Amino acid sequence: MNKKSTAIFLMGPTASGKTDLAIQLHQELPVEVISVDSALIYKGMDIGTAKPNAQELALTPHRLIDIKDPSENYSAAEFRRDALREMQKITQQGKIPLLVGGTMLYYKALLEGLSPLPSADEKVRLEIEQKAEKFGWATLHNELAKIDPISAQRINPNDSQRINRALEVFYLTGQSLTELTAQKGEEIPYHIIHFAIAPERAVLHQRIEQRFHKMIEQGFQQEVEKLYQRSDLHPNLPSIRCVGYRQMWEYLQGNYGKDEMIFRGICATRQLAKRQLTWLRGWKSPIEWLDSLNPKSAKEKIIKTIKHNCK
């Protein structure tokens, strides 16, 4: 039986220091970085996604960054396909894939494979959105509760994106999202070592607030204004629904003032971090937890573990 090649998952909430740690690891280990981030895939969305800058990318190239235009969709299935392709290239070079990011659904899809969910259908989605405009998303959430009570319990009544997808799956297949996701996909053909970096809640909240203000100073508004001027972009696209971008877009629409936009952006980012941590706490595979306040200790722990596993 062939021994599986090793790959590293470096997971964690937004603003936890994953990118800095990955850059340090790239200097000391034979690793190549693959981004696991549903926002970093978009070209022209750099400041609001805290994308590594040109200097950092020159030092440590990240694969699966800047691969899509903001007008395009990108599914977990596409990520899995692309990530496995890049992982194979890296292992063929005699190096270790280091997967870094906070999009936990991507990690799950990569690790466990995907159940046979149908592709998005614009016609069905539009019909659902029109129904929501007429009756409200709360009514559609009630409809979902009758079709798929487990998904309805998990999905917030205000989460229009996920309600839409759950109903879309049922309309297209006649089966609930819960039924379909119970069908296992193909597991990843790698030995994965799972690391997670997660600051204390107060520290994380402070970092998120500081980073959002820094993004504003760096020209985040101007970045979104360029997107806002494009006729092919609208608030229902996954790119514009990204945390921070949605709030800035609504500010540019005149929905509220700048202070309110900043407040909402920070709150939305904190909520994202909370969801990411919930995923991590429920992670099925054993996780090596890293000290976010001591990057040197975190780096040394990973190096020691990798060297031990790759003997």
From Swiss-Prot:
The keyword Transferase applies. InterPro entries: Dimethylallyltransferase, IPT, P-loop_NTPase. Gene3D superfamilies: 1.10.20.140, P-loop containing nucleotide triphosphate hydrolases. It holds the Pfam family IPPT. Keywords: ATP-binding, Magnesium, Nucleotide-binding, Transferase, tRNA processing. GO terms for molecular function: ATP binding; tRNA dimethylallyltransferase activity. Residues 37-40, 161-165, 241-246 are annotated as: Interaction with substrate tRNA. It catalyses: adenosine(37) in tRNA + dimethylallyl diphosphate = N(6)-dimethylallyladenosine(37) in tRNA + diphosphate. ATP binds at G12, P13, T14, A15, S16, G17, K18, T19. The record marks T103, R125 as: Interaction with substrate tRNA. Its EC number is 2.5.1.75. GO terms for biological process: tRNA modification. Its cofactor is Mg(2+). Substrate binds at T14, A15, S16, G17, K18, T19. Belongs to the IPP transferase family. Catalyzes the transfer of a dimethylallyl group onto the adenine at position 37 in tRNAs that read codons beginning with uridine, leading to the formation of N6-(dimethylallyl)adenosine (i(6)A). Monomer. NCBIfam families: miaA (TIGR00174). This is tRNA dimethylallyltransferase.
